[in-house]
């Protein structure tokens, strides 16, 4: 065992040995390792520090060995700030989203200095209109279906752009289907068709479509509304033609010009 043996230190029997093995350990302890008990046999383990914790090991053979565990104030400070920052900013972001999105939308759709409003072509319809025309299998591919409730002329500002068309019509009828048809001037049949329903009370019937522009020439469109094979449809009114809640109600047709994104 080399320099090995026993000696009496005060009242304690001490053992000193070179390359001693404890339990099932197969090699001597290395620098800064300690013996760690387990549920079976001891093992050699090395203590390490995690974020925010400082670990100082003094194992100079000429001095008393020591292990000092403390708090790394700088790292702990940064960790705490990061955690709090994430939570605070997350809460602020949620609050901003909840409280200001509508304000932003209202701003960009009402401020005439912003380009988005200029891109919209809005056509409000405020009259009460009785639509006696019907849409049937015989006339759906013609221009005879339904009743025209409005005409709209729009001029593209950019060749190759497209119009996103949105029609929201307040319609009432005795229970049954409602048909909306968008007609482009010069065509022999509707450009787009949509369907809605009324159970005797006013309902919002919508049509959504896109129109690709090939030039800068003004084009006129019309919107036709009618019952699905039967029934009279009222626009902006109750199914008997009276005002809804005694006030003027407004349907709307809008054209939004957009330019498709390219990879160029």
Swiss-Prot record:
Changing residue 90 to D: In plasmid pCHL1 and plasmid pCTT1. Changing residue 12 to E: In plasmid PCHL1 and plasmid pCTT1. The keyword Amino-acid biosynthesis does not apply. Changing residue 201 to I: In plasmid pCHL1. Changing residue 86 to N: In plasmid pCTT1. It comes from the Bacteria. Pfam families: Chlam_vir, Pgp3_helical, Pgp3_N. The keyword Signal does not apply. Changing residue 109 to K: In plasmid pCHL1. Keywords: Plasmid. InterPro entries: Chlamydia_pGP3 (IPR008444), PGP3-D_N (IPR049000), pGP3_C (IPR033758). PGP3-D is required for growth within mammalian cells. This is Virulence plasmid protein pGP3-D.
